Design a protein with these regions (language model features):
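A short, Lys/Arg-rich alpha-helix, primarily the initiator
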Residues: 2-23
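Anionic, Ser/Thr-rich low-complexity intrinsically disordered regions
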Residues: 13, 44-47
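Short alpha-helical DNA-recognition segment
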Residues: 25-44
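Alpha-helical residues within the helix-turn-helix
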Residues: 22, 33, 62
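DNA major-groove recognition helix of helix-turn-helix/homeodomain DNA-binding modules
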Residues: 55-70
């Protein structure tokens, strides 16, 4: 069985992603179109059910106009 990604630390990271999206005024659908991903992917990322790699995080940071470090503090 795989290790759960639902740690408190990862949930905090996922919460920051959602908060950043809301601060930009974008919907999950709008983000999904800009990142060329399904809306369900954005939902899973924000729920902490889908991990991101470093390049994906960079793409979110650029879209949300946030410094990369905002998400990993």
């Amino acid at each position: 069985m795989g290790k759960s990604i639902r740690t408190r630390e990862y949930q905090g990271f996922a919460h920051k992603l959602k908060k950043a999206r809301l601060e930009t005024g974008l919907t999950q659908v709008q983000v999904s179109k800009k990142l060329k991903r399904p809306q369900s992917y954005i939902s899973k990322v924000e729920a902490g059910e889908q991990r991101l790699d470093i390049i994906e995080l960079k793409n979110f940071a650029e879209l949300y106009k946030k410094d990369f470090h905002y998400f990993i503090k």
